[in-house]
Design a protein with these regions (language model features):
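A short, proline-enriched helix->beta-strand linker immediately N-terminal to the Walker B motif
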Residues: 165-171, 177
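The feature captures the beta-strand-to-loop junction immediately N-terminal to the Walker
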Residues: 41-43
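Conserved ABC nucleotide-binding domain
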Residues: 133-151
């Protein structure tokens, strides 16, 4: 069986304000297979988000390699990244457009990584689908399709972030706290 994620000897070193090096990830290796649920535990500043950023291909490692579906994640185009992985951030404001409505944010998530265009026409075409999906999740979002997300509660924003991350049914879902 081929691993969905292959993390080999990942090292991430950063420099602080005094030009001193700090090791954030130290020789981390991990294979994740289809249907695996992996929990990464650690205190604040332990490197969990750094690890997720590396897996997502948004933060280069100092050394080591990360492969998703057999391909080096650093070579992924935005389209390929959107196809294979999705993410929910610690802060539910990240990855969303606060002044846009719930429905508009869901539309962006649905077509993330694809060519832009036809936004208003697509929104009306998908509103019923989003309504049905939201009703399954609950958390009061079904009443807020036309509400800018800056007016949602923290829990509703987090539920929206999770819904946005799962819309494309990615191979890999990264949940950061």
């Amino acid at each position: 069986m081929t691993a969905i994620v292959e993390l080999k000897n990942a090292i991430k070193i950063v420099k602080n304000g005094f030009d001193e090096e700090k090791i954030i990830l130290n020789d981390v290796s991990l294979d994740i297979y289809e249907h695996d649920f992996i929990t990464i535990l650690g205190g604040n500043g332990a490197g969990k988000s750094t690890l997720f950023n590396g897996i997502a291909g948004t933060l280069p490692l100092t050394s080591g390699s990360i492969r998703i579906m057999g391909e080096d994640v650093t070579n992924f185009s935005p389209e390929k990244r959107a196809k294979y992985l999705s993410r929910v951030f610690q802060d539910p404001k990240m990855g969303t457009a606060p002044r846009m409505t719930v429905a508009e944010n869901l539309l962006i998530a649905k077509f993330r990584g694809e060519k832009r265009g036809l936004f208003p026409r697509r929104l009306s075409a998908y509103k019923e689908e989003f309504q049905a999906t939201i009703e399954k999740v609950g958390n009061g979002l079904e009443k807020h399709l036309d509400t800018p997300i800056e007016f949602l509660s923290g829990g509703q924003r987090q539920a929206l972030s999770l819904l946005m991350a799962t819309l494309k049914r990615p191979e890999l879902l990264l949940l950061d706290e």
